[in-house]
């Protein structure tokens, strides 16, 4: 539906359809998928490498997050921005608690750490959404612009994209499960890009920062993409078929 909405917006030049397609693709599709993967897999990964780690993966928590995420989506689609806090305050509480429960208390390797650093963007996202909605409700002023969305899209989605693709690429190419330099560079650079993009929403010369952030995306991901592209076109490092 989101893709169809975007295509329709291009054909009809209706910018409202772009808004709907982004919301459907973000909170309606990507967020439920990403948060479900985090809920099921990240504690499992931690349990395999961190001594004494206790898994915490209640389905009731996941169901509650899905329900409030759909409420958030519905309110956004209805343009009820001043009421988003009804979904986002609970989501902030749920994701903050989960981040605390999931976080390994012992030493963890880099390839695991980047997963949890990425997860930390979720409560920050809903803190920004909650603040934005409550300020709008109280004063009628819409502040922060798209900062909450960029915390979600670049901070959370972008971080976990690099972390998970690196993990799968290393493992399925017969390489050790470590964060290579290109992945570290991409990951750290994305954190900087996220902060700059959020900050650009409250600066006076926003278009300058848009350009800086766009270049930042390319600089961050190009070495990483080149490396994994080379791996995909090469035989497995351990000599096994595949």
Residue locations for each model-derived region?
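Alpha-helical transmembrane segments and their membrane-interface exit regions
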Residues: 27-35, 90-101, 216-223
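Juxtamembrane membrane-water interface segments of multi-pass membrane proteins
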Residues: 7-19, 36-58, 74-85, 98-116, ...
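Accessory "access/gating" subregions that flank catalytic or transport cores
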Residues: 69-73
